A protein has these predicted regions:
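Glycan-processing catalytic domains of CAZymes
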Residues: 1-236
Length: 236
């Protein structure tokens, strides 16, 4: 299959990682977890945790980043996720081998693209991992994704946007809170309109109306609750 090269012209996205629900009218793109089914008739992006473990998943200790005592290191922001050790080529190949079935599974279900979370996790490892390690593994992920017939997307890491777009050829980017942290231009200068941005209701810079009136964030910016509760549940 030939991978889609970019997102549809009309980017009205919905970000459904906390659980799938019928997208609102007018939505053209849906992001769902790799364990979910795509939304019928729309452009679906498959969420894959590319650089950390998913809560409850089973990974060999040899592929996890360890501290000096030999214990896996958890992400300080998400203590039930552990860093994957992408510091060596052998590890990168072994980690990729575990993720390729997930990528192929997304393609088989009918997803059109995949986004790989935690490209920026190296910034939270106290120097144990580097940007070079992250980029090297991202390149492998993107190649495997394109080989499966899916477009590959960058997730966050504005500092790497120009580099990974040039070196890897990511088709699009999914950013979180680029308006809140004044990072949107880092993405739009590189990816143009191929940007989906999510702002969270508990930490906006002004009202959402002000966010939308600001020319900096992409037109595809959407507002979500922090826990990404499915529509119809309390907190959505």
């Amino acid at each position: 299959a030939v991978a889609a090269s970019e997102l549809p012209d009309t980017i009205n996205a919905d970000y459904q990682l906390g659980g799938a629900y019928v997208p609102p009218a007018g939505v053209t793109i849906v992001v769902r977890d790799s364990t979910a089914k795509p939304a019928p008739g729309l452009f679906n992006i498959c969420y894959i945790n590319g650089f950390q473990t998913q809560p409850g998943s089973d990974w060999p200790k040899a592929l996890l980043l360890l501290d000096t005592k030999g214990n896996p290191i958890a992400d300080p922001n998400w203590p039930d996720e552990y860093f994957l050790d992408v510091s060596t080529d052998a590890n990168r190949k072994a980690i990729l081998a575990k993720l390729v079935p997930v990528i192929k599974g997304c393609a088989a279900k009918g997803f059109k693209a995949a986004e790989f979370d935690n490209l920026d996790s190296y910034t939270r490892t106290d120097g144990r991992l580097s940007a070079a390690h992250a980029v090297a593994f991202a390149k492998m992920l993107a190649a495997a994704t394109n080989a499966a017939g899916l477009a590959a997307g960058q997730k966050n890491a504005p500092d790497l946007a120009r580099r990974v777009k040039a070196e890897i050829g990511f088709s699009f980017v999914v950013s979180e809170e680029c308006h809140r942290w004044d990072e949107c231009r880092a993405y739009t200068d590189v990816y143009g309109k191929q940007v989906i941005n999510i702002e969270y209701s508990d930490d906006l810079r002004g009202t959402f109306e002000k966010v939308c009136a600001d020319p900096q964030p992409p037109k595809s910016t959407i507002l979500r609750d922090r826990l990404l509760v499915p529509k119809g549940k309390a907190g959505y």
